[in-house]
Amino acid sequence: MSRFEKLQNHVLIIPSMLVVAVFGILPLAFIVLVSFYQASFEGFIPVFTPSNYSALFGSALTAKVLYTTLRLSAITVALALVLGYPIAYTLAYKVRSPRKQTFVLLMLIIPFLMDYSIRTLSWYPILGAKGFVNIFLQQAGVTSGPLSLLFSESSLIAIWLQTYVLFMITPIYLALVKIDPSGVDAARTLGASSWQAFLSVTLPLSLPGVVVGSIYVLVSTISDYATPELFGGGIQTVGLEIAQRASSFLWPEAAAFAVLLILVFLALSYLVLRFVDIQQLF
């Protein structure tokens, strides 16, 4: 590659680097900066202080909220993987027609074209006291009265699963369609069963998609505040804690909690990416 071509490549990436810097790095840097400021009725006073972090790490509520959020998010990721992997596998290997694959993908994507609040609130007529599930259970004689299905950890996980499972399906599907079928054929030729070929060839090669999907779902659920506020029934999550502090104009405290959240994201991503190379997905 000539010097001119190298210079041309560098010039071409300048606009994208500026976008990342302005809309990504600078806001994060501002959040970190505000997290060291003093809170006031006007939002914050630009006076350096570590008191926000002292209060954050010295509070038992922080550990409780972080544990609850990570536990519920991990359960959601596991369920999304159990549900999403078979769907992605079926779409990649069982649906042969590209037209049918496109149709199925559109059917999965169309609900996400609706407003998030509408999709979330649609769970009320499903899980509510007079919702479809309770009416069905009562008419079937399973229960004598309506069950309290909303405002619980189970309902929160179910709504998260419905909302973010597509984020698990898509990267797994992209990883599966990139797998060379000759590897599976070679395993079968050497005497491996379909299940053994899947475990030894398909699953390891699809791990980048699993990792990317898991990170997507984990980040989305940990940072979500609207769903816990509407359906959590008093369950405190990290995203909800940040939103409540920000709405109360406790911006430095909210920023400190946000920095903690970012550090958790980075730590989890680092641990996972040490063992899986997601560049194979692209």
PLM segments and residue spans:
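Membrane-water interface segments at the C-terminal ends of transmembrane alpha-helices
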Residues: 5-41, 56, 60-177, 201-223, ...
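Short hydrophobic, aromatic-rich alpha-helical segments embedded in or entering the lipid bilayer
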Residues: 44-58, 233-245
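Membrane-helix/interface signature in polytopic inner-membrane proteins
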Residues: 173-185, 193-194
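Hydrophobic positions on the alpha-helical face of helix-turn-helix-like DNA-binding modules
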Residues: 186-187, 197, 242
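Glycine/proline-centered hinge or cleavage motifs at structural transition points of membrane proteins
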Residues: 190-192, 204
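Membrane-helix boundary and inter-helical linker elements of multi-pass secondary transporters
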Residues: 247-249
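Short cytosolic juxtamembrane segments of multi-pass membrane proteins
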Residues: 275-282
